[in-house]
Amino acid sequence: MISKEQAAEKAIAEFITGITELPEWVKLYKINHHSPSQANTSDDMWGYKYLYLTQEERRDLPINSKMFSGVCIGDMGQLEFGNFIWEYEKGKGLTKKPIPPTRKVFEKIIEKFNQYGPANEDDKIQHDVNRKGLALLFDQFKKGFREVGLKGEIECERSVELMLPDCVLPMIGRVDFEDADQFIELKTKWRKKNRPRKDGTSSYSLPKIDEGYLGWNEHLLQVAFYFLATGKKPNLLVVHEEGYNLFNENNCDDLKPENLKLLLNKMKIV
């Protein structure tokens, strides 16, 4: 079965064939697009990942439990609320497919969660911590999702692109959840390890999720991309196991359209 990452690469390759003039470095390094996450990557790390490593080596880079746990919450959200998901189909590219009704969503995804292979011992401990909060966080996510109030058909992972000023390659990303008028960018926050106690043990505490939290500026940039690419009302839903915050133009100046548009120039520095 083709992975989401491989499906995205195939769809992007098809999109790139429509660009008639590409510089030599694009062919040399096999770079065919930028992504919203790349816009938040430092130059040295970007150079290492996209100029030094091959595409196959990038795919083998380890992720961490917090990232994987966030993916699992997204998967649960798709099964719980989604009507359609965009997946790659050979010969057709990305195709809109119905999401069949699913019972016992949490039980289904916990199987995937338990198959995760930790990168090291610290990551294993973090994954065990995440497991304890997974159901609680999913409950908070459902409350936040319902507050947004998406209506009609809800689509998941639709691929959208944006040509940035002075850039020869498109920026491409996939929308977490959307209806005809608005979208949700989901961010999950997991307990973080505190400084070790005198006896060498450590506790784990919940991070802040109020405006300006750690990672706020990076997430704003991603929301700005999806806003500019879709023209839909943005909602940034940030969740941890004891609560959630929903940010949009009604309660956050940073997410007003005029302010998101100001991030366009910053976005193109990739």
Protein language model features and the residues they cover:
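Mg2+/Mn2+-dependent nuclease catalytic core
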Residues: 153-269
